[in-house]
């Protein structure tokens, strides 16, 4: 397959191809412009992959620009996390990082130009009055009583705003467009508002800050962006984007194109709702492995490659839709099935004693790190007469469909011996505390000599060599596919979204590092937690199960 054939095809790429073929543009220049007021989520990953991916494929450029026009909500912590997320996903921005605040002087000059042209005015209506005057979808707005001020008066009042002569909320600069427009965004939108707050880049130089719709288009033009890609909620804003650029003296006029945002089942993408989950401590932070944030997915064990593949599979369209969580999970499952080394861990342990195994002795059994990749090598795992197995892998009685250990019957221990359950010990409540077995000493990694068939295989960990591990079984944060539609989205949080177990792992897990996944054989894919794991306490997060159990539950 050629490079061109391997590229994804979508309507945005078709537009770019046409622009290049017609000579409208000779290069492609995109940008990713997040506001640094929170952590990026999987929806932002779609935009990152689109903007940076297009720049890569067309040998163009993609800027990382922080839309930092609201100092009250923004923080350098978010700037750093966003930079880290973009790099972790495998992308690199062109040149230096940009900030909308880099252009505050130019933005102010363009605002003055609009005033001089009679296209902007200082309004002293309150924010509540501005909303009231704006009208509704079915009723036109009405003009502010301050709309017809002279150019000279507006210039003087705008300067008064800039120098701190008004209190917050007492004045703003508005575009003079059309209060009867069928598009509410065009009903004299606010261009500048007053905020007496220190800015993380400009300090206290400014007390007036430009609005997104005024800043965004001018920043695109100043940077020479050829294709400004936004999600569909900004479709109506394109009219204002074009109006601003049409009415100022600027040589470049980028075009805005909209695509559908990513909606994912069993989670929320609203920054307000995500913030509420964090501040009300329903989760442990923005990087909680149940969160849809990139940092949360990374901590859970998702790889950058799996997220890029997910974004590639869902594609880019203008049609809003909701993606099944199973689609995201299948991407990480396929990635880790192919690349994760195997290990054995017992999540719900019960002791098994092999009564005829030499007492006090142990041996090493060789296990492949990956059943289909001999190049990944093998490891030596200690085996002894006392092992941990998973409680679910033993039954005193079972039907023929149960292929694990049953009283009086045989099963194979993974890469070790065939054993037979002989008896059990129980506590006062009737819970099994120990399973006693015998083993066939001539079956180490081979079939019994007499030809009898042993169908089941279970995993195990030697008691004498086991590493105590904490296992965090993460699941979907919400119990319904569309929590955002619930009257109270907090009421549908999945109470089983985190279950903590104390188990045992094989000794090789001592070398585990955060972010590197294992397949715990027969259990799922897990990675060492980056927050809670220490040298003395191993904590593993479940990234995803071996199979999509939610799909089965819904059938």
Swiss-Prot record:
L-glutamine binds at residues 67, 212. GO terms for molecular function: ATP binding; glutamine-tRNA ligase activity. GO terms for cellular component: cytosol. InterPro entries: aa-tRNA-synth_I_CS (IPR001412), Gln-tRNA-synth (IPR004514), Gln/Glu-tRNA_Ligase (IPR050132), Gln_tRNA_ligase_bac (IPR022861), Glu/Gln-tRNA-synth (IPR000924), Glu/Gln-tRNA-synth_Ib_cat-dom (IPR020058), Glu/Gln-tRNA-synth_Ib_codon-bd (IPR020059), Glu_tRNA_lig_a-bdl (IPR020061). It is found in: Cytoplasm. The keyword Protease does not apply. This is Glutamine--tRNA ligase. It comes from Salmonella typhi. The gene is glnS.
